[in-house]
Amino acid sequence: MIEISNLFFNYQNKEVLKIKNLKLDTSKISILMGANGSGKSTFLRILKFLEGDFSKNISYFGNFKPNNKQKREIYLLFPEPILLNRSVRANFLFTLKTYGIKEDIEERIKESLMFLNLDESLLSKHPNELSSGQSQKIAFAIALSVRAKYYLLDEPSAFLDKNTTLLFKKTILKMHENFNTGFLIASHDKHFLDSLAQKKLYLHSGEILEFENTNVFELENQGVKFCNFIDFSNCKKYKDFKKPPSKIAIDPYKISFFNSKNIPKNNYDFILEKCYIIALRSRKSDVFIRVSCMDKILEFALEKQEFLRFDLKLYEELSLYFYEDAICFLN
Protein backbone atom coordinates (compact mmCIF):
# COMPACT_ATOMS: atom_id res chain seq x y z
CA MET A 1 0.00 0.00 0.00
CA ILE A 2 1.16 3.51 -0.83
CA GLU A 3 -0.54 6.19 1.28
CA ILE A 4 -0.46 9.87 0.34
CA SER A 5 -1.53 12.85 2.42
CA ASN A 6 -1.32 16.59 1.77
CA LEU A 7 0.89 16.32 -1.30
CA PHE A 8 1.18 19.67 -3.08
CA PHE A 9 3.44 20.32 -6.06
CA ASN A 10 3.97 23.61 -7.92
CA TYR A 11 5.77 24.20 -11.19
CA GLN A 12 6.60 27.73 -12.41
CA ASN A 13 4.15 29.23 -9.90
CA LYS A 14 1.38 26.92 -11.09
CA GLU A 15 -0.23 24.39 -8.77
CA VAL A 16 0.10 21.05 -10.56
CA LEU A 17 -0.90 18.59 -7.82
CA LYS A 18 -2.95 18.96 -4.64
CA ILE A 19 -3.69 15.52 -3.25
CA LYS A 20 -5.13 15.57 0.26
CA ASN A 21 -5.65 11.84 0.81
CA LEU A 22 -5.11 8.87 -1.48
CA LYS A 23 -4.38 5.18 -0.97
CA LEU A 24 -2.90 3.10 -3.79
CA ASP A 25 -3.37 -0.64 -3.42
CA THR A 26 -0.08 -1.98 -4.77
CA SER A 27 -1.57 -5.42 -5.39
CA LYS A 28 -4.10 -4.09 -7.93
CA ILE A 29 -4.06 -2.82 -11.51
CA SER A 30 -5.02 0.83 -11.19
CA ILE A 31 -5.38 3.27 -14.05
CA LEU A 32 -4.81 7.01 -13.94
CA MET A 33 -6.60 9.05 -16.57
CA GLY A 34 -6.49 12.74 -17.32
CA ALA A 35 -5.95 15.22 -20.11
CA ASN A 36 -2.52 15.89 -21.59
CA GLY A 37 -0.59 18.18 -19.27
CA SER A 38 -2.78 17.36 -16.28
CA GLY A 39 0.18 16.14 -14.20
CA LYS A 40 0.04 12.36 -14.65
CA SER A 41 3.74 12.03 -15.51
CA THR A 42 4.72 14.36 -12.67
CA PHE A 43 2.75 12.24 -10.22
CA LEU A 44 4.51 9.06 -11.38
CA ARG A 45 7.93 10.75 -11.12
CA ILE A 46 7.13 11.81 -7.56
CA LEU A 47 6.15 8.24 -6.65
CA LYS A 48 9.50 7.05 -8.06
CA PHE A 49 11.47 9.61 -5.98
CA LEU A 50 12.46 11.66 -9.06
CA GLU A 51 10.72 14.92 -8.10
CA GLY A 52 11.14 16.77 -4.80
CA ASP A 53 11.23 15.43 -1.26
CA PHE A 54 7.85 14.12 -0.13
CA SER A 55 9.07 11.84 2.66
CA LYS A 56 6.53 13.42 5.04
CA ASN A 57 3.64 12.97 2.62
CA ILE A 58 4.07 9.51 1.10
CA SER A 59 4.25 6.21 2.95
CA TYR A 60 5.55 3.21 0.98
CA PHE A 61 4.52 -0.17 2.38
CA GLY A 62 4.28 1.42 5.84
CA ASN A 63 7.51 3.45 5.60
CA PHE A 64 7.84 7.20 5.13
CA LYS A 65 11.58 6.77 4.58
CA PRO A 66 12.00 3.56 2.58
CA ASN A 67 15.51 2.16 2.23
CA ASN A 68 17.12 1.51 -1.16
CA LYS A 69 15.81 -2.06 -1.31
CA GLN A 70 12.26 -0.86 -0.69
CA LYS A 71 12.66 1.91 -3.26
CA ARG A 72 13.55 -0.71 -5.84
CA GLU A 73 10.12 -2.29 -5.32
CA ILE A 74 8.83 0.60 -7.47
CA TYR A 75 9.68 0.57 -11.20
CA LEU A 76 8.87 3.46 -13.54
CA LEU A 77 8.63 2.78 -17.28
CA PHE A 78 8.86 5.96 -19.37
CA PRO A 79 6.79 6.53 -22.55
CA GLU A 80 9.84 6.31 -24.83
CA PRO A 81 12.26 3.39 -24.44
CA ILE A 82 15.53 4.23 -22.71
CA LEU A 83 18.28 1.76 -23.65
CA LEU A 84 22.03 1.98 -23.09
CA ASN A 85 24.31 1.88 -26.14
CA ARG A 86 25.25 -1.75 -25.62
CA SER A 87 23.72 -5.12 -26.46
CA VAL A 88 20.20 -5.99 -25.36
CA ARG A 89 21.64 -8.70 -23.08
CA ALA A 90 23.97 -6.13 -21.50
CA ASN A 91 20.97 -3.85 -20.93
CA PHE A 92 19.18 -6.67 -19.12
CA LEU A 93 22.24 -7.47 -17.00
CA PHE A 94 22.84 -3.82 -16.09
CA THR A 95 19.25 -3.34 -14.90
CA LEU A 96 19.14 -6.60 -12.95
CA LYS A 97 22.45 -5.74 -11.26
CA THR A 98 21.17 -2.23 -10.43
CA TYR A 99 18.15 -3.80 -8.74
CA GLY A 100 20.36 -6.14 -6.72
CA ILE A 101 19.21 -9.31 -8.49
CA LYS A 102 21.87 -12.03 -8.61
CA GLU A 103 19.86 -15.24 -9.03
CA ASP A 104 17.76 -16.74 -11.83
CA ILE A 105 19.19 -14.21 -14.29
CA GLU A 106 18.76 -16.32 -17.43
CA GLU A 107 15.33 -17.51 -16.34
CA ARG A 108 14.14 -13.93 -15.85
CA ILE A 109 15.48 -12.81 -19.22
CA LYS A 110 13.95 -15.73 -21.13
CA GLU A 111 10.62 -15.39 -19.35
CA SER A 112 10.26 -11.66 -20.04
CA LEU A 113 11.20 -12.16 -23.71
CA MET A 114 8.61 -14.94 -23.95
CA PHE A 115 5.90 -12.72 -22.42
CA LEU A 116 6.39 -10.24 -25.26
CA ASN A 117 6.94 -12.73 -28.09
CA LEU A 118 10.55 -11.64 -28.54
CA ASP A 119 13.17 -13.96 -30.02
CA GLU A 120 16.34 -14.60 -28.01
CA SER A 121 18.40 -13.67 -31.07
CA LEU A 122 17.64 -10.03 -30.21
CA LEU A 123 19.86 -10.31 -27.12
CA SER A 124 22.96 -9.74 -29.26
CA LYS A 125 21.51 -6.68 -31.01
CA HIS A 126 22.29 -3.06 -30.16
CA PRO A 127 19.60 -0.35 -29.87
CA ASN A 128 20.43 1.11 -33.31
CA GLU A 129 19.69 -2.31 -34.84
CA LEU A 130 16.18 -2.47 -33.38
CA SER A 131 12.95 -1.13 -34.83
CA SER A 132 10.98 1.33 -32.71
CA GLY A 133 8.48 -1.41 -31.87
CA GLN A 134 11.23 -3.82 -30.84
CA SER A 135 12.85 -1.13 -28.67
CA GLN A 136 9.52 -0.53 -26.92
CA LYS A 137 9.06 -4.24 -26.26
CA ILE A 138 12.66 -4.71 -25.08
CA ALA A 139 12.35 -1.81 -22.61
CA PHE A 140 9.17 -3.36 -21.22
CA ALA A 141 10.77 -6.83 -21.08
CA ILE A 142 13.73 -5.46 -19.12
CA ALA A 143 11.31 -3.83 -16.68
CA LEU A 144 9.40 -7.09 -16.21
CA SER A 145 12.58 -9.10 -15.59
CA VAL A 146 13.02 -7.18 -12.33
CA ARG A 147 9.65 -8.49 -11.04
CA ALA A 148 9.09 -5.34 -9.02
CA LYS A 149 6.24 -5.19 -6.55
CA TYR A 150 4.65 -2.14 -8.20
CA TYR A 151 5.05 -0.81 -11.74
CA LEU A 152 4.37 2.77 -12.81
CA LEU A 153 3.68 2.81 -16.56
CA ASP A 154 3.63 6.22 -18.22
CA GLU A 155 1.59 6.16 -21.46
CA PRO A 156 2.68 2.59 -22.31
CA SER A 157 0.49 2.41 -25.44
CA ALA A 158 1.46 5.83 -26.84
CA PHE A 159 3.63 4.54 -29.69
CA LEU A 160 2.21 1.04 -30.13
CA ASP A 161 0.22 -0.52 -32.94
CA LYS A 162 -3.00 -2.39 -32.18
CA ASN A 163 -1.41 -5.86 -31.96
CA THR A 164 1.40 -4.73 -29.67
CA THR A 165 -1.07 -2.88 -27.46
CA LEU A 166 -3.04 -6.11 -27.05
CA LEU A 167 0.19 -7.98 -26.27
CA PHE A 168 1.11 -5.43 -23.58
CA LYS A 169 -2.34 -5.82 -22.01
CA LYS A 170 -2.02 -9.62 -21.91
CA THR A 171 1.47 -9.33 -20.42
CA ILE A 172 0.30 -6.99 -17.66
CA LEU A 173 -2.46 -9.45 -16.75
CA LYS A 174 0.02 -12.37 -16.76
CA MET A 175 2.42 -10.53 -14.46
CA HIS A 176 -0.43 -9.65 -12.13
CA GLU A 177 -1.64 -13.25 -12.07
CA ASN A 178 1.77 -14.96 -11.81
CA PHE A 179 3.54 -12.63 -9.36
CA ASN A 180 0.72 -10.62 -7.74
CA THR A 181 2.35 -7.57 -9.32
CA GLY A 182 0.53 -4.25 -9.07
CA PHE A 183 0.41 -1.57 -11.75
CA LEU A 184 -0.44 2.11 -11.88
CA ILE A 185 -0.95 2.92 -15.56
CA ALA A 186 -1.16 6.56 -16.61
CA SER A 187 -2.78 7.10 -19.99
CA HIS A 188 -5.61 8.81 -21.82
CA ASP A 189 -6.04 5.78 -24.11
CA LYS A 190 -9.46 4.64 -22.88
CA HIS A 191 -9.54 1.53 -25.09
CA PHE A 192 -6.21 0.35 -23.67
CA LEU A 193 -7.28 0.94 -20.08
CA ASP A 194 -10.89 -0.18 -19.82
CA SER A 195 -10.35 -3.94 -19.82
CA LEU A 196 -7.42 -3.71 -17.39
CA ALA A 197 -8.77 -1.53 -14.62
CA GLN A 198 -9.43 -2.89 -11.17
CA LYS A 199 -9.37 0.67 -9.86
CA LYS A 200 -9.97 3.89 -11.79
CA LEU A 201 -8.43 7.23 -10.91
CA TYR A 202 -8.88 10.53 -12.72
CA LEU A 203 -6.55 13.53 -12.41
CA HIS A 204 -8.41 16.81 -12.76
CA SER A 205 -7.28 20.29 -11.68
CA GLY A 206 -4.48 18.76 -9.62
CA GLU A 207 -6.78 16.48 -7.64
CA ILE A 208 -7.15 12.74 -8.04
CA LEU A 209 -10.70 11.46 -8.15
CA GLU A 210 -11.30 7.77 -7.55
CA PHE A 211 -13.43 7.47 -10.67
CA GLU A 212 -13.33 8.76 -14.24
CA ASN A 213 -14.45 12.12 -15.57
CA THR A 214 -17.98 11.32 -16.80
CA ASN A 215 -19.50 12.78 -13.64
CA VAL A 216 -17.67 16.13 -13.55
CA PHE A 217 -19.93 19.17 -14.05
CA GLU A 218 -19.53 22.94 -14.20
CA LEU A 219 -21.18 24.80 -11.32
CA GLU A 220 -23.53 27.64 -12.23
CA ASN A 221 -25.14 29.73 -9.52
CA GLN A 222 -23.68 27.32 -6.95
CA GLY A 223 -25.48 24.36 -8.49
CA VAL A 224 -26.10 22.19 -11.55
CA LYS A 225 -29.22 22.16 -13.73
CA PHE A 226 -30.24 18.60 -14.38
CA CYS A 227 -33.99 18.07 -14.91
CA ASN A 228 -34.30 19.78 -11.58
CA PHE A 229 -31.82 22.38 -10.30
CA ILE A 230 -29.55 21.04 -7.56
CA ASP A 231 -28.11 23.67 -5.22
CA PHE A 232 -24.86 22.53 -3.60
CA SER A 233 -24.03 25.73 -1.71
CA ASN A 234 -25.22 24.39 1.65
CA CYS A 235 -22.76 21.49 1.59
CA LYS A 236 -20.07 21.62 4.25
CA LYS A 237 -17.46 20.79 1.59
CA TYR A 238 -18.60 23.80 -0.45
CA LYS A 239 -18.34 26.14 2.53
CA ASP A 240 -14.81 24.89 3.26
CA PHE A 241 -13.57 26.49 0.00
CA LYS A 242 -12.12 29.99 0.41
CA LYS A 243 -12.83 30.68 -3.25
CA PRO A 244 -16.10 29.29 -4.68
CA PRO A 245 -15.36 26.04 -6.56
CA SER A 246 -16.02 25.93 -10.30
CA LYS A 247 -16.82 22.23 -10.75
CA ILE A 248 -18.37 19.30 -8.94
CA ALA A 249 -17.61 15.58 -9.29
CA ILE A 250 -20.07 12.86 -8.27
CA ASP A 251 -18.73 9.40 -7.41
CA PRO A 252 -20.61 6.80 -9.54
CA TYR A 253 -20.06 4.16 -6.86
CA LYS A 254 -22.04 6.26 -4.36
CA ILE A 255 -25.09 6.94 -6.53
CA SER A 256 -28.22 4.85 -5.95
CA PHE A 257 -31.51 4.70 -7.83
CA PHE A 258 -35.18 3.92 -7.57
CA ASN A 259 -38.02 3.56 -10.00
CA SER A 260 -39.35 7.02 -10.82
CA LYS A 261 -42.93 5.93 -10.19
CA ASN A 262 -42.18 4.85 -6.63
CA ILE A 263 -40.08 7.59 -5.06
CA PRO A 264 -39.77 6.90 -1.32
CA LYS A 265 -40.16 9.73 1.15
CA ASN A 266 -36.79 9.25 2.83
CA ASN A 267 -34.67 12.33 3.45
CA TYR A 268 -32.03 12.07 0.72
CA ASP A 269 -29.47 14.86 0.31
CA PHE A 270 -29.86 15.07 -3.47
CA ILE A 271 -32.34 13.56 -5.94
CA LEU A 272 -32.12 13.67 -9.75
CA GLU A 273 -35.43 13.03 -11.47
CA LYS A 274 -36.30 11.87 -14.99
CA CYS A 275 -33.05 10.08 -15.79
CA TYR A 276 -33.17 7.77 -18.82
CA ILE A 277 -30.76 4.88 -19.38
CA ILE A 278 -28.89 5.43 -22.64
CA ALA A 279 -25.99 2.95 -22.38
CA LEU A 280 -24.78 -0.05 -20.40
CA ARG A 281 -21.18 -1.21 -20.19
CA SER A 282 -19.71 -4.11 -18.28
CA ARG A 283 -16.28 -3.96 -16.66
CA LYS A 284 -14.84 -6.72 -14.47
CA SER A 285 -17.35 -7.18 -11.62
CA ASP A 286 -19.35 -3.98 -12.25
CA VAL A 287 -21.86 -2.63 -14.72
CA PHE A 288 -21.83 1.10 -15.46
CA ILE A 289 -25.24 2.57 -16.28
CA ARG A 290 -25.08 5.78 -18.28
CA VAL A 291 -28.12 8.02 -18.06
CA SER A 292 -29.33 11.19 -19.71
CA CYS A 293 -30.81 13.85 -17.46
CA MET A 294 -31.92 16.76 -19.66
CA ASP A 295 -28.67 17.82 -21.38
CA LYS A 296 -26.39 16.20 -18.78
CA ILE A 297 -24.87 12.72 -19.02
CA LEU A 298 -23.77 10.86 -15.91
CA GLU A 299 -23.03 7.31 -14.78
CA PHE A 300 -23.59 5.14 -11.76
CA ALA A 301 -22.18 1.70 -10.99
CA LEU A 302 -23.78 -1.55 -9.87
CA GLU A 303 -22.23 -4.91 -9.09
CA LYS A 304 -23.13 -7.40 -11.84
CA GLN A 305 -25.29 -9.51 -9.54
CA GLU A 306 -27.25 -6.43 -8.48
CA PHE A 307 -27.68 -5.35 -12.08
CA LEU A 308 -29.08 -8.77 -13.05
CA ARG A 309 -31.44 -8.70 -10.08
CA PHE A 310 -32.91 -5.33 -11.03
CA ASP A 311 -33.05 -6.23 -14.74
CA LEU A 312 -32.51 -2.65 -15.92
CA LYS A 313 -33.21 -1.91 -19.58
CA LEU A 314 -32.18 0.76 -22.07
CA TYR A 315 -34.42 3.86 -22.06
CA GLU A 316 -35.91 2.94 -18.68
CA GLU A 317 -36.72 5.97 -16.51
CA LEU A 318 -35.08 6.21 -13.09
CA SER A 319 -34.54 8.69 -10.32
CA LEU A 320 -31.06 8.86 -8.81
CA TYR A 321 -30.09 9.89 -5.30
CA PHE A 322 -26.87 10.43 -3.40
CA TYR A 323 -25.50 11.99 -0.23
CA GLU A 324 -22.88 14.65 0.37
CA ASP A 325 -20.11 12.06 0.79
CA ALA A 326 -20.50 11.24 -2.94
CA ILE A 327 -19.44 14.69 -4.12
CA CYS A 328 -16.11 16.45 -4.51
CA PHE A 329 -15.71 20.12 -5.39
CA LEU A 330 -12.96 21.27 -7.76
CA ASN A 331 -11.45 24.62 -8.66
Swiss-Prot record:
Belongs to the ABC transporter superfamily. It comes from Campylobacter jejuni subsp. jejuni serotype O:2 (strain ATCC 700819 / NCTC 11168). Part of an ABC transporter complex involved in ultra-high affinity tungstate uptake. Probably responsible for energy coupling to the transport system. Its EC number is 7.3.2.6. One of its GO terms (molecular function) is ABC-type tungstate transporter activity. Pfam families: ABC_tran (PF00005). PANTHER family: ABC TRANSPORTER I FAMILY MEMBER 17. The gene is tupC. This is Tungstate uptake system ATP-binding protein TupC. NCBIfam families: tung_ATPbind_TupC. It is an enzyme of class 7 (translocase). InterPro entries: AAA+_ATPase, ABC_transporter-like_ATP-bd, ABC_transporter-like_CS, ABC_transpr_CbiO/EcfA_su, P-loop_NTPase, Tungstate_ABC_transporter. Disulfide bonds: none annotated. CDD domains: ABC_cobalt_CbiO_domain1. Residues 2-230 form the ABC transporter domain. The complex is composed of two ATP-binding proteins (TupC), two transmembrane proteins (TupB) and a solute-binding protein (TupA). ATP binds at G34, A35, N36, G37, S38, G39, K40, S41. It comes from the Bacteria. SUPFAM superfamilies: P-loop containing nucleoside triphosphate hydrolases (SSF52540). The lineage of its organism: Bacteria, Pseudomonadati, Campylobacterota, Epsilonproteobacteria, Campylobacterales.
